A protein has these predicted regions:
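RNA pseudouridine synthases
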Residues: 1-157
């Protein structure tokens, strides 16, 4: 995953992370396209014993992923994603489960023909500063490899 990364330097910041008080916005490029322009995907994810992969399981932890389609291309879509829960590989595993693995995500069945890594980017992170109580938003532009995919023909061309 490329983009913004947040580290906790103290217990208060760590509590914000674990309590899901930090809002992350992701950009992903998925295989195919959703029928609806936006939606909420819910499932239960469980880690494999070595935590290399997550999979949907009835005894997994609840997982909520919201998406909004930004652009549709021939064979894939650019989507905006936010997560209400923070599970290991949540976006990757959820998109694959719903039939739309990330481009470049070999672990979850995505094609590596157009990009060699999972096409997932943390576009922004928003949180309340622990001392000033002001909302801080940090953002990061899409990396070159994902920008190149945006230059391919759109589905309506």
């Amino acid at each position: 995953v490329s983009g913004v990364m947040v580290y906790a330097k103290n217990k208060h910041a760590a509590a914000q992370l674990s309590d899901h008080q930090i809002r992350k916005q992701y950009t992903a490029i998925i295989t195919g396209q959703f029928e609806e322009p936006s939606g909420r995907l819910e499932c239960r994810l469980k880690k494999t014993p070595y935590e290399r992969q997550a999979f949907v399981s009835d005894d997994g932890k609840a997982c909520i992923t919201d998406y909004e389609v930004q652009e549709v291309y021939v064979g894939y879509s650019l989507i905006s994603v936010s997560i209400a829960t923070g599970r290991t590989h949540q976006i990757r595993a959820t998109m694959a489960y719903y039939g739309h693995p990330l481009l470049g995500d070999k672990l979850y069945g995505g094609s590596t023909e157009l990009i060699r890594r999972p096409a997932l980017h943390c576009s922004s992170v928003a949180f309340v500063h622990p001392k000033t109580k002001k909302k801080i938003t940090v953002s990061c532009d899409l990396p070159h490899d994902m920008l190149q995919l945006k230059s391919l023909p759109a589905d309506n061309e």
